């Protein structure tokens, strides 16, 4: 059985939950031997402890620092792109290769269908996203979710295919950054990302981008130009990671918490700045605590956004998308 990953700030809660579990086990195993008043006293203690656990849970997860949200975004049990694809869509057909060099396993994508039997909504879509691994072997296979140039070119090929068949595009972003190796630079990493930005701005079909975990720098923006930009509640999106920012400004990774605060990289930060359009709520404790509930929430929001975008003409989509991104980063100077 795999060991549960516990983050530093979660340890007090986990310890209290373990104590609660022991008390419940004690009550179940010895209830027949205990006197009624002893069992009642233990039950009262359990009730008191349950309230303490819930109060501590609320206190921790409703007051997360920016760095703690970065940690949650990187949680190894968090749902990844393929998890969401299989929970949200049906009839997924994965497509491979960039038709130039190779098939980058850090990017996955293909046609699928989003359906809702209650509302009757049914829409074929192209889903594309970064894919990380769960262990050392799969992370090496997926290159830790860091795409090569051929990954971004594969993504663009699939986007153009979706445009040809008039199908909306959904991108799921979760990467620590584009792969920075020499071989990636030699094959045109910067050009591949820049080309995606240029082409995505002009796509004549609806494009919805969702940051589901990490959204680091050019590796994220290479899949991040769309009509709607959504962010999971405990994800982050920034030009640089807190550790890299800390190492540049303070010559040490020890100031990553301060860097995270300065970068303002969380979903509420970016919503207030007009960078994203909507926050996708997560279950208490993060998406990994209830993946299916998280997928259900995201599916409902995607259906809402698709329903709003599908009636728009190609010209309306392109014009509003270009205007949306052109207006970012505008500020006024006073004094």
From Swiss-Prot:
UniProt source species: Chlorobium phaeovibrioides (strain DSM 265 / 1930) (Prosthecochloris vibrioformis (strain DSM 265))
Organism taxonomic ancestry: Bacteria, Pseudomonadati, Chlorobiota, Chlorobiia, Chlorobiales
Pfam families: ACCA (PF03255)
GO molecular function terms noted in the UniProt entry: acetyl-CoA carboxylase activity; ATP binding; carboxyl- or carbamoyltransferase activity
GO cellular component terms, A-Z: acetyl-CoA carboxylase complex
Catalytic reaction equation(s): N(6)-carboxybiotinyl-L-lysyl-[protein] + acetyl-CoA = N(6)-biotinyl-L-lysyl-[protein] + malonyl-CoA
Gene: accA
UniProt xrefs under InterPro entries: Acetyl_CoA_COase_a_su, ClpP/crotonase-like_dom_sf, COA_CT_C
Listed pathway(s): Lipid metabolism; malonyl-CoA biosynthesis; malonyl-CoA from acetyl-CoA: step 1/1
Name assigned to this protein: Acetyl-coenzyme A carboxylase carboxyl transferase subunit alpha
Keyword vocabulary terms for this entry: ATP-binding, Cytoplasm, Fatty acid biosynthesis, Fatty acid metabolism, Lipid biosynthesis, Lipid metabolism, Nucleotide-binding, Transferase
Predominant subcellular localization, coarse grouping: cytoplasm
């Amino acid at each position: 059985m795999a060991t549960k990953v516990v983050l530093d700030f979660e340890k007090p809660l986990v310890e209290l939950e373990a104590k609660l579990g022991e008390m419940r086990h004690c009550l179940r195993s010895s209830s027949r031997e205990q006197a009624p008043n002893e069992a009642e006293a233990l039950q009262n203690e359990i009730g008191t402890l349950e309230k303490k656990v819930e109060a501590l849970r609320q206190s921790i997860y409703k007051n997360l620092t920016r760095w703690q949200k970065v940690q949650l975004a990187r949680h190894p049990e968090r749902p990844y792109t393929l998890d969401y694809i299989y929970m949200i869509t049906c009839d997924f057909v994965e497509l491979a290769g960039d038709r130039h060099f190779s098939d980058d396993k850090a990017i996955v994508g293909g046609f699928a269908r989003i359906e809702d039997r209650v509302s009757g909504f049914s829409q074929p879509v192209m889903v594309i996203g970064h894919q990380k691994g769960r262990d050392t072997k799969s992370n090496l296979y997926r290159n830790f979710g860091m795409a090569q140039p051929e990954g971004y070119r594969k993504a663009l090929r699939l986007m153009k295919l979706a445009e040809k068949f008039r199908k909306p595009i959904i991108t799921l972003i979760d990467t620590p950054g584009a792969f920075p190796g020499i071989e990636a630079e030699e094959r045109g990493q910067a050009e591949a990302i820049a080309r995606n930005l240029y082409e995505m701005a002009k796509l004549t079909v609806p494009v919805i981008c969702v940051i589901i975990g990490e959204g680091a720098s050019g590796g994220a923006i290479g899949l991040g130009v769309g009509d709607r930009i959504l962010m999971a509640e405990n994800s982050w999106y920034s030009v640089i990671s807190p550790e890299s920012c800390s190492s540049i400004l303070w010559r040490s990774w020890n100031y990553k918490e301060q860097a995270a605060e300065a970068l303002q990289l969380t979903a509420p930060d970016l919503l207030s700045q007009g960078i994203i359009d909507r926050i996708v709520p997560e279950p208490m404790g993060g998406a990994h605590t209830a993946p299916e509930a998280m997928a259900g929430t995201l599916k409902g929001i995607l259906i809402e956004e698709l329903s709003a975008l599908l009636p728009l003409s190609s010209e309306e989509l392109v014009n509003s998308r270009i205007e949306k991104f052109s207006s970012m980063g505008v500020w006024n100077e006073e004094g």
